[in-house]
């Protein structure tokens, strides 16, 4: 395999995947044209967030439907779903570097994760394991700099469109028997058919 292949790592709950995720990926491929593939990696449990609702098989099926609408190379990996307990990014990166020794990796994180990145497990080690960390904006055009980080590593900020939606908000809409926007038709049909977020 060509050592020049640059690969993005995009983790998250994806419970469910939505248009915000879509715009992030589109912006990333547009701005980082030398990146040929992105690994989308759903976590089993984010140590800093609430527990997930859907079963792993539901998450994977929704993601398969979600990425089917992209022309770029996006691969879904279930290595974090197979682990028990919290999902730690450092463990995932090191595992990927073992599986794909000739690839170079960049990490995609949201502005919220950028703000608390210094609270992640082995966060300083992560900075040595990836080429770059790209930060996507979710709710604000200007992301406050994290003073714990920028003297150690150059983070790059994507110019993605702001789509203020979260998977948590979408689940709440479903729980309230409201059909939300900002979900692709394929994913929405799957959710409704399988009653994933019904009371």
UniProtKB/Swiss-Prot annotation:
Pfam families according to UniProt: CTP_transf_like
Gene: nadD
Top-level EC class as recorded in UniProt: transferase
Family: Belongs to the NadD family.
NCBIfam families in alphabetical order: nicotinate (nicotinamide) nucleotide adenylyltransferase (TIGR00482)
Pathway membership: Cofactor biosynthesis; NAD(+) biosynthesis; deamido-NAD(+) from nicotinate D-ribonucleotide: step 1/1
Name of the protein: Probable nicotinate-nucleotide adenylyltransferase
Keywords from the UniProt entry: ATP-binding, NAD, Nucleotide-binding, Nucleotidyltransferase, Pyridine nucleotide biosynthesis, Transferase
GO biological process, one term: NAD biosynthetic process
Domain of life: Bacteria
InterPro entries the record matches: Cyt_trans-like, NadD/NMNAT, Rossmann-like_a/b/a_fold
Catalytic activity annotation: nicotinate beta-D-ribonucleotide + ATP + H(+) = deamido-NAD(+) + diphosphate
SUPFAM superfamilies: Nucleotidylyl transferase
Role description: Catalyzes the reversible adenylation of nicotinate mononucleotide (NaMN) to nicotinic acid adenine dinucleotide (NaAD).
Assigned EC number: 2.7.7.18
GO molecular function: ATP binding; nicotinate-nucleotide adenylyltransferase activity
């Amino acid at each position: 395999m060509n050592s020049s292949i640059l690969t993005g790592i995009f983790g998250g709950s994806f419970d469910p995947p939505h248009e915000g995720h879509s715009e992030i990926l589109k912006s990333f491929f547009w701005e980082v044209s030398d990146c040929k593939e992105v690994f989308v990696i759903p976590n089993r449990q984010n140590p800093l967030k609430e527990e997930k609702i859907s079963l792993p098989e539901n998450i994977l099926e929704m993601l398969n439907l979600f990425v089917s609408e992209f022309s770029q190379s996006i691969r879904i990996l279930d290595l974090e779903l197979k682990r028990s307990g919290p999902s730690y990014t450092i463990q995932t990166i090191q595992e990927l570097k073992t599986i794909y020794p000739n690839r170079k990796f960049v990490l995609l994180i949201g502005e919220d994760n950028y703000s608390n990145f210094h609270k992640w497990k082995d966060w300083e080690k992560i900075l040595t394991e990836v080429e770059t960390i790209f930060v996507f904006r979710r709710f604000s055009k200007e992301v406050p700099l994290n003073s714990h980080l920028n003297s150690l590593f150059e983070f790059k900020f994507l110019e993605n469109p702001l789509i203020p939606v979260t998977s948590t908000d979408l689940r709440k809409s479903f729980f309230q028997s409201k059909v939300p926007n900002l979900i692709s038709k394929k994913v929405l049909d799957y959710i409704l058919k399988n009653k994933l977020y019904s009371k």
